[in-house]
């Protein structure tokens, strides 16, 4: 799923309002994927929809602009960092189950490491504890143990 890999690697910067889908796809995929605070839910949902639809079609033109008011979007609120980290772990577990055929795919492992890096350092602004880092690393370990330990030790240095 090229769209998913590009999204995980940060090559696509998109928001939920930019996706259009049919009721048929929504029903066949089981609706929206639910995680706490809707964190990672859009990425998981679009991946599931794309899998059921056989891909995603991009329309040419200008990107969609929408307002993201600071403090009004629960997913961006620093007060929910613990919930967001837990949702990230659930997302990684969901990815492992949904894409079990690609567990050993180096491109997927790299994309997941990029995604985790972005979440820990940018989205969560480094507001997480060692237990949270361990949890995310172990969830990644369900794909690749080496990537899990690399991720853990790379981010562990922030606690020193």
Model-based region annotation:
Residues 38, 62-70, 76-105, 130-141:
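Catalytic core of nucleotide-sugar-dependent glycosyltransferases
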Residues 120-160:
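Membrane-interface aromatic/basic loop that binds lipid-linked glycans or pyrophosphate carriers
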Residues 89, 96, 113-116, 153:
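Residue-level detector of alpha-helical secondary structure
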Residues 1-79:
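Conserved nucleotide-sugar donor-binding catalytic segment
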Residues 11, 29-32, 98, 102, ...:
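Alpha-helix C-capping/helix-to-loop hinge sites
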Residues 41-42, 108-112:
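Short, conserved alpha-helical segments within structured domains
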Residues 110-122:
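Amphipathic alpha-helical repeat scaffolds of TPR domains
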């Amino acid at each position: 799923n090229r769209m998913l890999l590009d999204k995980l690697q940060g090559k696509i910067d998109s928001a939920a309002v930019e996706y259009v889908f049919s009721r048929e796809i929504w029903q066949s995929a089981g609706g929206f994927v639910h995680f706490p605070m809707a964190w990672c839910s859009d990425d998981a949902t679009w991946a599931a929809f794309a899998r059921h639809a056989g891909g995603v079609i991009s329309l040419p033109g200008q990107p969609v602009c929408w307002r993201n008011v600071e403090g009004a979007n629960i997913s961006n609120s620093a007060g929910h960092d613990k919930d967001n980290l837990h949702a990230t772990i659930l997302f990684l577990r969901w990815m492992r189950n949904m894409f079990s055929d690609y567990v050993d795919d180096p491109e997927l492992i790299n994309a997941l490491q990029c995604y985790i890096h972005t979440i820990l350092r940018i989205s969560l602004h480094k507001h997480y504890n060692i237990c949270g880092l361990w949890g995310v690393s172990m969830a990644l370990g369900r794909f690749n143990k080496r990537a899990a330990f690399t991720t853990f030790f790379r981010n562990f240095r922030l606690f020193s």
